[in-house]
């Protein structure tokens, strides 16, 4: 299985995400309720969703998180996303740039993003396992320069690597030390990003206490990359595929992950992603502790249909976010971060089991600016 090229794998990943059922688990956003305010005190037109992220102003706290690149057809997806987020004033990340570092001829499928979105927050992307295999500051800077990125996400996908037919699940502590060292030499921040299994308090603490303050939760309830590798394994009669079925919903629900990360990274910046599917869930993520809402799969499905499809999807999300803010009496994103919320039983039990005091956490989330 080692001879499967990165290029073939990237195509297969996108194809499976588009045509197979890859969503498993719960985000637990159903356990987060915003309080309805019958008299908001202002009109819907007064609601402002503007925010700042990575030093740039955004029309709404929404990014399309890293998905793909590396082939002309995948570069076209990146190009479509970039054009739309530039027009709407949003942000985006690219998929893993390892392929462009190892195959220079594929760089254009990533660099097109900055050409089409000169003013938007753009996030570069490399995989954590590569830092065990020799990646260093040089490769990180190359990925950043390739797209003139405002930050670089280092994605952690241990659950996916375990079940990937050609996976290399090596997550030694060397990764932590390398990233801490690299972060001190960069002009842009590192974002610690999960890949569908959620970030825990423990992992957040490792990085936050060493100066890394940006996190992307990517919790359960959205795309299960274990399921993606299960489908790939089934096609190859790989023995791991049957075991993968036990772990399809493995991980931390997105809502719980947001709280776990915020409870540690109290002045950090958090992208709440993983199963976020609409503007109401963006509002819930931000009220709960995130700064930005992140989308991947629904944006991919819209983008492959063309620019208009993605534009319509994101306009709908922004409208839903505004409605949620209006009905909960919040005129700005700053107010939304402090709005009253009710936590349901399952999420409350999770947080209790993890030793997170809800009264104390409520004061933490409301201190955000």
From Swiss-Prot:
A Gene Ontology BP annotation from the UniProt entry: isoprenoid biosynthetic process
Pfam family, one: FMN_dh
Alphabetized InterPro entries for the sequence: Aldolase_TIM, FMN-dep_DH, IPdP_isomerase
Molecular function per GO: FMN binding; isopentenyl-diphosphate delta-isomerase activity; magnesium ion binding; NADPH binding; oxidoreductase activity
Catalysed reactions, as listed in the record: isopentenyl diphosphate = dimethylallyl diphosphate
Cell division among keywords: no
GO cellular component, one term: cytoplasm
Enzyme Commission number(s): 5.3.3.2
Enzyme class: isomerase
Family annotation (Gene3D superfamilies): Aldolase class I
Cofactor(s) named in the record: FMN; NADPH; Mg(2+)
UniProt binding sites for FMN: 65-68, 96, 125, 193, 218, 223, 275-277, 296-297
Keyword NADP carried by entry: yes
Residue ranges of coiled coil: none
Location relative to the cell: Cytoplasm
Binding site for substrate: 9-10, 96-98, 160
Assigned keywords, A-Z: Cytoplasm, Flavoprotein, FMN, Isomerase, Isoprene biosynthesis, Magnesium, Metal-binding, NADP
Superkingdom, taxonomy of origin: Archaea
Family matches, as NCBIfam families: IPP_isom_2 (TIGR02151)
Protein task: Involved in the biosynthesis of isoprenoids. Catalyzes the 1,3-allylic rearrangement of the homoallylic substrate isopentenyl (IPP) to its allylic isomer, dimethylallyl diphosphate (DMAPP).
Sequence similarity: Belongs to the IPP isomerase type 2 family.
Cross-referenced HAMAP family: Idi_2
Subunit structure as annotated in this protein's UniProt entry: Homooctamer. Dimer of tetramers.
Name the record gives this protein: Isopentenyl-diphosphate delta-isomerase
């Amino acid at each position: 299985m080692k001879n499967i090229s990165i290029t073939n794998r990237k195509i297969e990943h996108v194809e499976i995400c588009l045509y197979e059922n890859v969503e498993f688990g719960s985000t637990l956003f159903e356990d987060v309720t915003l309080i309805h305010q019958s008299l908001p005190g202002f009109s819907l037109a007064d609601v402002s969703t503007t925010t700042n992220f990575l030093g740039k102003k955004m029309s709404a706290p929404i990014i399309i998180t890293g998905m793909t690149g590396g082939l002309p057809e995948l570069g076209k997806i990146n190009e479509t996303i970039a054009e739309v987020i530039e027009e709407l004033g949003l942000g985006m990340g690219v998929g893993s740039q390892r392929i462009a570092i190892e195959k220079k001829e594929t760089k254009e499928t990533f660099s097109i993003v900055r050409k089409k979105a000169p003013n938007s927050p753009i996030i570069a992307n490399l995989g954590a396992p590569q830092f065990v295999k020799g990646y260093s500051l040089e490769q990180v800077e190359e990925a950043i320069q390739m797209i003139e990125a405002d930050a670089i996400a280092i994605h952690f996908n241990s659950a996916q690597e375990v079940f990937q037919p050609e996976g290399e699940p090596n997550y030694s502590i060397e990764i932590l030390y390398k990233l801490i060292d690299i972060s001190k030499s960069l002009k842009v921040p590192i974002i610690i990003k999960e890949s569908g299994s959620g970030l825990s308090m423990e992992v957040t603490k490792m990085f936050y206490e060493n100066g890394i303050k940006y996190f992307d939760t990517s919790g359960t309830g959205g795309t299960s990359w274990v399921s993606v590798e299960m489908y790939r394994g089934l096609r190859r009669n790989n023995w791991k595929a049957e075991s993968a079925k036990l772990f399809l919903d493995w991980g931390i629900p997105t809502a719980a992950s947001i709280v776990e990360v915020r409870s540690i990274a109290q002045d950090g910046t958090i992208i709440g992603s993983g199963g976020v599917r609409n503007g109401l869930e963006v509002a819930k993520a931000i009220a709960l502790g995130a700064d930005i809402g992140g989308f991947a799969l629904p944006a991919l499905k819209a983008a492959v249909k063309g620019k208009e499809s993605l534009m319509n999807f994101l306009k709908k999300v922004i409208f839903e976010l505004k409605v949620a803010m209006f009905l909960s009496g919040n005129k700005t994103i700053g107010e939304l971060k402090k709005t009253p919320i009710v936590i349901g039983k399952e999420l409350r039990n999770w947080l209790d089991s993890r030793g997170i005091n809800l009264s104390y956490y409520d004061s933490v989330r409301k201190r955000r600016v």
